Amino acid sequence: MENRLNYYKIERDEWSNFYQEHIVPLTEEELLNLKSLNDQISLKDVQDIYMPLVHLLRIHLDSHQELQDSQSEFLGVKAQKVPFILGIAGSVAVGKSTTARLLQSLLSEVYPDKKVQLITTDGFLYPNQELKRRNLMERKGFPESYDMRRLLRFVNDVKNNLPAKAPVYSHKVYDIVKGQYEIVESPDILIVEGINVLQLPTNQQIYVSDFFDFSIYVDAEESLIEEWYLERFETLLDTAFKDPTNYYYPYAIGDRKQAIKMAKNIWKTINLKNLREFILPTRNRADLIMHKTNNHVVNELFLRKY
């Protein structure tokens, strides 16, 4: 195991040997339902990468609870349940959603008596109407397109065991779904997934990541992420051509080459720019970096030392 800055660099084979006591509690069909459109993951990936990760999270969860109990004893007050919040960051199309859903499923199996919930920060984007009013549609996904105050209130309420609700975002309509919310109420574990969860907004005195008990950054080379982004775009077109209400319908029934050309331009002018300027700089704030190579295979991990 190579030491690198303030991270341990751990190759896949070494990581997979850290914890082999439990068999993967998933079937192929269940795993298929958890993965995103064009993401690739196998039961072997779950066994080699995610089962050791769940064991590591269990160590942090136990430490989290022990700290809360000890601090309450020190203060002479009754111990309160404080939700454990796990943040998952990374570029568009890198596979964050699959990682988040898979961890939710595995943690629910490991902790059958605990409530494990998941939300994405997509729901805290301003609605398209508001983005247009602010002339921000071309900046959708950049820091200024999110209602960060609302997101901060949300995670603060969760930490304080107050009922909280997260707006729902639909990739089908490419907008916030009016009147729909994900209700989060007294979870034991909350997973917060999004490109912006480790960012440091310049106009805030407190950050979303201040509420995290553990954070993961899903990483890959730019060229691979672009490839996955374009693959996902084509998959969306393949599923949208029968649904006129789908945001991608006009592109699905139009000239495919022109649609792909447009997607490449969006990648270059928006997603790649956002990755380089605002997402990648947050990588070294994560507790764990999961690095992917071809076919979404995790080939190495970087675990923060302290």
Curated annotation (Swiss-Prot):
Cleaved signal peptide residues: none
Subcellular localization(s) per the UniProt record: Cytoplasm
Alphabetized InterPro entries for the sequence: P-loop_NTPase (IPR027417), PanK (IPR004566), PRK/URK (IPR006083)
Molecular-function GO terms, alphabetical: ATP binding; pantothenate kinase activity
EC code(s) of this entry: 2.7.1.33
GO CC, alphabetical: cytoplasm
UniProt keyword list: ATP-binding, Coenzyme A biosynthesis, Cytoplasm, Kinase, Nucleotide-binding, Transferase
Stated family: Belongs to the prokaryotic pantothenate kinase family.
HAMAP family: Pantothen_kinase_1 (MF_00215)
Nucleotide-binding recorded as keyword: yes
Gene: coaA
Gene Ontology BP term (one): coenzyme A biosynthetic process
Catalytic activity: (R)-pantothenate + ATP = (R)-4'-phosphopantothenate + ADP + H(+)
The keyword Cytoplasm belongs to this UniProt entry's keyword annotation: yes
Binding residue positions for ATP: G90, S91, V92, A93, V94, G95, K96, S97
Top-level taxon of origin: Bacteria
SUPFAM superfamilies, alphabetized: P-loop containing nucleoside triphosphate hydrolases
Protein name (record): Pantothenate kinase
